Amino acid sequence: MMTTPELSCDVLIIGSGAAGLSLALRLAEKHKVIVLSKGPVSEGSTFYAQGGIAAVFDETDSIASHVEDTLIAGAGICDRHAVEFVASNARTCVQWLIDQGVLFDTHVQPNGKESYHLTREGGHSHRRILHAADATGKEVETTLVSRAQNHPNIQVLERSNAVDLIISDKMGLPGPRRVVGAWIWNRNKEWVETCHAKSVVLATGGASKVYQYTTNPDISSGDGIAMAWRAGCRVANLEFNQFHPTALYHPQARNFLLTEALRGEGAYLKRPDGSRFMPDVDERGELAPRDIVARAIDHEMKQLGADCMFLDISHKPDDFVRQHFPMIYAKLLDLGMDLTKEPIPVVPAAHYTCGGVVVDDYGRTDVDGLYAIGEVSYTGLHGANRMASNSLLECLVYGWSAAMDIDRRMPSVHSVDALPAWDESRVENADERVVIQHNWHELRLLMWDYVGIVRTTKRLERALRRITMLQQEIDEYYANFRVSNNLLELRNLVQVAELIVRCAMMRKESRGLHFTLDYPQQLAESGPSILSPLTPHINR
């Protein structure tokens, strides 16, 4: 058994987006924190978030209204307590973000007072979205990254992937099962390191990379969900994958999102002949929840045999469009399209994982000392469909609550002196990496075709059979060859793909983001789809 380089901290945070960094900054006043980032520290879904953060700042709005809008969007299976918990703590947590230096757009009211410019997005009954033009995530992420990198108690490790969690019972330690650290793949040095930690937090984001078309960056491979499942944690509602209705249809920008706020400010969805179709689908038109809009676009494309639909805001004044959407306007100009003059081609794409690792109000999972916050988690906030701009808010609120719980418990947690080293004595360098590439493409294509916007029981059964075969191939490959970034992500993706399909097969109805032709109606009563591991997987 080889000797493994070792790291040590009070709290290991796996992920460097809004959830991970807000938690790190709250904890670092009293505790030593390590933050893992799979790529450059700012490369994650937070950085690319365009819309904004939902919170009640307008005196005509109310927390009760925010709660009701979220419950309606969630199609009847949100956890009301979780929704009220998030909405009631929203303003305080957004104010904390402002105190860190995040600059949201402001405007001068008719009475001469300056206030935050609030926009409205799908599902919201009021203007309550704080934003920084059309690049809110970039403003949030760069501010938090700067604060974290300059904090003496925070060590940010870039190009570092968590391989797996280290759990106490695998080491023969007495007492409740708890996390004691993790193995980390250092891509810079191409070796596996062992990290001792009193608490470990999964802030790894979602799993939209499991689909062929996604708005997410390449790192969204479901790592935290897969690691938590292997450690023995329950997962829930993974059948609810949000497909953003309006990803740009262009070969040079396949991951580029056209924010919900465009429709909030009056953009229309049109067929290739220029006619609108959303007013015939829903009384809210283009401001209907995302699942309804995405399904409508998918239906129109299939019915017409069209490659895309079109998003048109050219009827608004040019200056208005350029002022409110400067980043999108500039990006489209680079691609030869003028947002102020012409309709823009759009298609739905996998955007957000509404389910995840089951947690409580403090982000606690089923394993002591292991937390999950942000998109990786299932809090009950989103139900069967996430309402726009509640995702960054969820990151902030659970970053705050998890920090309180970790800080409260820290004095009673004792670190483990010796952790098992990573064993590479029986593996060799990969022989044919084409195996990984082939399985990668096959998995993402079958998930898109069989487990996409519209599903059937037969499609799900086909998907599960093929996923099971892929798992066997990938597990064999993982057992015999040294780890690599692509292998780690593929192993996690195929695990999450299985969980998505199993959750989808449990739900004998159509609800929110899960639509199946075999059960097109919504049941009168329903709840979350919860999967429990029979036995935790054995770490290598």
UniProtKB/Swiss-Prot annotation:
Residue numbers annotated as active site: R290 (proton donor/acceptor)
Entry EC number(s): 1.4.3.16
GO CC terms: cytoplasm
Cofactor(s), by name: FAD
Biological-process GO terms, alphabetical: 'de novo' NAD biosynthetic process from L-aspartate
Keyword ATP-binding recorded: no
Organism the protein comes from: Salmonella typhimurium (strain LT2 / SGSC1412 / ATCC 700720)
Reactions listed under catalytic activity: L-aspartate + O2 = iminosuccinate + H2O2
Subcellular location: Cytoplasm
InterPro entries in the cross-refs: FAD-dep_OxRdtase_2_FAD-bd, FAD/NAD-bd_sf, Fum_R/Succ_DH_flav-like_C_sf, Fum_Rdtase/Succ_DH_flav-like_C, NadB, Succ_DH/fumarate_Rdtase_cat_sf
Family: Belongs to the FAD-dependent oxidoreductase 2 family. NadB subfamily.
The name this protein goes by in its record: L-aspartate oxidase
